Amino acid sequence: YQEAYSFLQDLTSHFKILYSPRGLGYGDLHTHVNDLCAIAGGEYLFLWNDDATITTHGWDNIIREHQEGLHGNPVAVIQIDNNHAWKFGFPLVHKKIYETIGHFSLNAHNDTWIHWVAEQAGVERMEWRIMSEHDRYDLTADPKMRDETYTDIWNEQHGGYHQTHQLLLSNEQTLIREQDSLKIRNMIKG
């Protein structure tokens, strides 16, 4: 870690490192995302993966347009395009939304959670000028991507994809998302 830390320090002084237990792996992904959001200092929180790349040159200038209010209220969830059918995988969430609801997500399906909440609250904005490539094994069949992180998603002993998806669809979590959307709408109204 020291080598990576030194590299980051040379690159920028605006980073934080968070060490935490692995927990249940994919089943606890939302816990890690929420922990990172709590210490983030930026205006937007960007849900991202280590197997993804933004391919649009100048994408940060496009986000700056949203930040400056050129496309409506900057307090929004901005969705970007990618190379597969699910178009809500890498949202940028305004920090006020996180602060208003007190979390990014309460389920490992962070992208789906915030998409449903933002859509219902009327604060979701599509930004298809920004393109990303997601090199996930089940999308690209790239054998080097069939690693421990990928296989952990399907591990039912640790609350893998199917268990967390069932929880996501439960009445309890649906009600929480409805409450999240209402909190956001009330915050936007002032």
Regions found by a protein language model. Give the residues of each.
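Active-site nucleotide-sugar/metal-binding loop of Leloir-type enzymes
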Residues: 31-44
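Conserved donor-nucleotide/metal-binding helix-loop-beta segment in metal-dependent transferases, i.e.
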Residues: 57-77
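Short beta-strand-to-loop acidic/aromatic patch adjacent to the donor-nucleotide binding site
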Residues: 42-53
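Short beta-strand-to-loop element that shapes/binds the nucleotide-sugar donor at the catalytic cleft/hinge
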Residues: 74-90
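Acidic donor-binding segment of Leloir-type glycosyltransferases
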Residues: 1-23
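Aromatic-glycine-rich donor-binding/catalytic loop that engages nucleotide-sugar donors
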Residues: 93-110, 117-126
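C-terminal catalytic/acceptor-binding lobe
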Residues: 112-190
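Short, acidic/glycine-rich phosphate-metal binding loop used to engage nucleotide
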Residues: 19-29, 53, 83-84
